[in-house]
Amino acid sequence: MFTTVVLQQVEAGELSLDDPLSTWFPDLPAADQVTIDMLLHHTSGYPHYTEIQSFLDRLWANPFQHWEIQDLVDIGVAGGPVFTPGTDWLFSDTNTLILQQVIEKVTGRSAGELLQEDIFDALGMDDSTAAFDANWPSPVLHGYSDERGVWEDVTNWSPTWTYTAGGVGADQEDVRVFLDALGDGSLLSPELHDQQFAPTTAGLGPWTDQQYWAMGFLQLDGWVFLNPGLSGYYGAGGTIPEEGWTMVVYTTPSQGGDQSAPTATDIFRQFTAVVTPEHSLEQ
């Protein structure tokens, strides 16, 4: 969702896809080489901060703590890019948080305000929140996890360790509404919609012309696909705009459950073989 917010600001003339990061944050590693486009496509080379052990140690020690976005960015960029920016692909939530900082700087508005006004309100998504706190509106699906060595309710863990990279809450119907708007381009100009969907990352990392990372989502054999996840939760959603198919799946782990049990993504893939065999994602 936040990628669309970024592109809306590009459309408004607040920034350009070719702008270097040094325009706003010259002290970040390789800031003169990394562009807004690279952050959106995950070709900056900045590591995925959620896979860095020092971050995980702090997170598991106190999952209720409030994180400052700059602390997370600092962890993610500490070692600099792992490849020359623009030459390879690596998914990294560090990119998303840097984009959040940029957008908040150029607009003078918080990411939560932008999501609420320009996405949720615009689409009538009344059961969505970007407050980035643990006070989820009721009723809320409870998530559980044993990642800290004990089975526990993780519903009220602080989502500030993700911000716009995963701290948005929405029910399945609101996710469907957003996916439909993402697919039909109703939130962007035709030009930016085309750029958002272009196979720019094809040939980088694992991506091809048929399966690639677009701006903010995966394009998989015709499916516009998202698979967000947090501790205690799995999500998968996708749409085929040309055919009018949209599916959203949420799952949570079960105590003592089979670790190989299907996740939301597994279930989604299985259903694609039933509803659209010609676009099946089942391996």
Task: Place the predicted regions along the sequence by residue.
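Short, well-ordered beta-strand elements
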Residues: 236-257
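Generic hydrophobic/packing signal
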Residues: 6-10, 25, 40-47
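Hydrophobic "lid"/C-terminal helical patch
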Residues: 6, 178-179, 271
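Short, glycine/proline-biased beta-turn/loop segments that scaffold the active-site neighborhood
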Residues: 16-31
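Short, gly/Ser/Thr-rich active-site loops of penicillin-recognizing serine hydrolases
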Residues: 201, 210, 255-283
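Short, surface-exposed loop or secondary-structure junction motifs
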Residues: 32-231
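Active-site SXXK
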Residues: 1-18, 99-104, 175, 244
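A general structural signal for well-ordered alpha-helical segments in protein cores
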Residues: 2-3, 36, 69, 268
